[in-house]
C-alpha cells in the first residue's frame, strides 16, 4: 500500500489523502497451487491478489462450486481482496492469445466468448467486480482487414455484455503491443463503437510504455475508463519484457502522482509472470520498492 501526501503546509504537517492499493498476480506462481500463492501474497503484505483464470490456477472448466467456495473462504481468512480476475491467456485449450476474440473460425471464437462468460460468473462468486481480457487478439495471421477485425471483436464482446451487466462485473480490455488494440487512440476508437458501461480498461503501464506513449498524459487521457492497473517495469529500449519495478526506466513516482490526481481508488496489480522460478522473491522485492517510493 502506497501513501501519497500533500506537500508540507506552513505548519510543517502532511495531510495524507491518497492510498494506492497494491496486489500481486498469481500468474507468477504457476509452479504453486492457487491456495499457496494466495497465502504467500497475503503473507508478504499485499492488499490484494489477482487470480489467473487459466491452468494451473482457476480455469473455470476445472473450478467446481466447492472449489470456488474454498478459494473464497481462503481469501476471507487471509484478509486479502481479489483485485482482478485475469482472463487474458487460455493455455487450458490454446496458448497465450488463442482462441482469441477475433478468430475467423466461429467455433474457436466461441470458446473465447464462453470462457469469458464463465470468468464473469466466477468473478461474481468470488466478490470481484472486474475481469481483464486480451484486446481482440493477434492480427498478423488474419485475412481480415482492421475494420472487419474490430467488428468481429465488438460482436464477440456483445455476447458477453448481458451476462456481465446482470452479474455487475466489468470486462476490462488490456491493450498490448502487436495485438488489435495497442495504444490509447485505438482503445478510444473501440470505445466509441461500444455502448455498454461494463466495458472498461485495464491500464497496463508497461504495455503503453512499450508502444511509445507518455504514461502520465495517457492516464489523464483514459482516466474515465480505467478500472485497474497492471504494474511492471520496462527497459529503455521499450521491449515488451516485464521487469521488476525499479529495474527499468519507468518513472513510477510521476505515474503514481498522476493516478492520484485522476482520483483512481482501485487496485494496481504487479504482474511478473516471467519470474516463475522465484515468484515470492520478486513479489517481496517489488513491494519493498513500491512502498519505498517517496511521492
Residue ranges and their predicted role:
Residues 6, 12-15:
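Short hydrophobic alpha-helical segments enriched in small aliphatic residues
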Residues 47-52, 83-87, 132-134, 223-235:
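Non-cysteine beta-strand/loop elements that form the S-adenosyl-L-methionine
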Residues 52, 85, 175-176, 206, ...:
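Short strand-turn motif at the edge of the Rossmann-like AdoMet-binding core
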Residues 35-36, 77, 92-200:
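Active-site acidic/histidine proton-transfer and metal-coordination neighborhood
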Residues 56-59, 93-98, 139-144, 210-211, ...:
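A short acidic, helix-capping loop that chelates divalent metal ions and anchors anionic groups
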Residues 52-72, 135-141:
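Glycine-rich, proline-tolerant flexible connector loops at the mouths of alpha/beta enzymes
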Residues 14-23, 28-45, 69, 76, ...:
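Histidine-acidic metal/acid-base catalytic patches
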Amino acid at each position: 500500500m502506497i501513501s501519497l501526501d500533500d506537500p508540507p503546509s506552513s505548519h510543517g504537517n502532511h495531510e495524507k489523502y491518497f492510498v494506492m492499493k497494491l496486489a500481486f498476480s498469481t500468474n507468477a506462481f504457476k509452479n504453486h497451487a492457487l491456495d499457496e500463492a494466495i497465502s504467500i501474497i497475503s503473507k508478504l503484505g499485499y492488499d490484494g491478489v489477482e487470480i489467473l483464470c487459466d491452468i494451473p490456477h482457476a480455469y473455470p472448466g476445472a473450478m467446481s462450486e466447492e472449489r470456488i467456495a474454498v478459494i473464497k473462504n481462503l481469501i476471507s481468512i487471509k484478509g486479502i481482496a481479489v483485485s482482478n480476475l485475469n482472463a487474458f491467456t487460455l493455455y487450458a485449450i490454446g496458448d497465450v492469445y488463442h482462441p482469441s476474440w477475433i478468430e475467423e473460425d466461429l467455433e474457436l471464437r466461441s470458446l473465447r466468448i464462453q470462457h469469458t462468460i464463465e470468468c464473469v460468473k466466477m468473478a461474481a462468486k468470488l466478490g470481484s467486480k472486474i475481469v481483464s481480457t486480451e484486446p481482440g487478439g493477434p492480427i498478423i495471421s488474419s485475412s481480415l482487414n482492421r475494420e472487419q477485425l474490430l467488428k468481429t471483436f465488438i460482436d464477440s464482446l456483445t455476447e458477453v455484455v448481458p451476462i456481465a451487466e446482470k452479474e455487475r462485473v466489468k470486462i476490462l480490455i488490456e491493450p498490448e503491443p502487436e495485438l488489435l488494440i495497442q495504444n490509447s487512440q485505438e482503445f478510444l476508437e473501440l470505445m466509441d463503437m461500444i455502448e455498454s458501461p461494463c466495458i472498461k480498461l485495464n491500464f497496463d503501464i508497461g504495455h503503453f510504455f512499450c508502444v511509445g506513449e507518455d504514461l502520465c498524459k495517457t492516464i489523464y487521457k483514459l482516466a474515465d475508463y480505467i478500472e485497474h492497473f497492471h504494474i511492471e517495469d520496462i527497459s529503455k529500449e521499450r521491449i515488451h519484457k516485464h521487469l521488476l519495478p525499479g529495474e527499468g526506466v519507468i518513472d513510477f513516482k510521476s505515474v503514481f502522482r498522476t493516478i492520484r490526481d485522476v482520483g483512481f481508488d482501485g487496485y494496481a496489480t504487479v504482474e511478473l509472470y516471467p519470474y516463475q522460478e522465484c515468484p515470492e522473491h520478486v513479489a517481496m522485492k517489488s513491494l519493498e520498492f513500491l512502498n519505498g517510493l517517496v511521492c
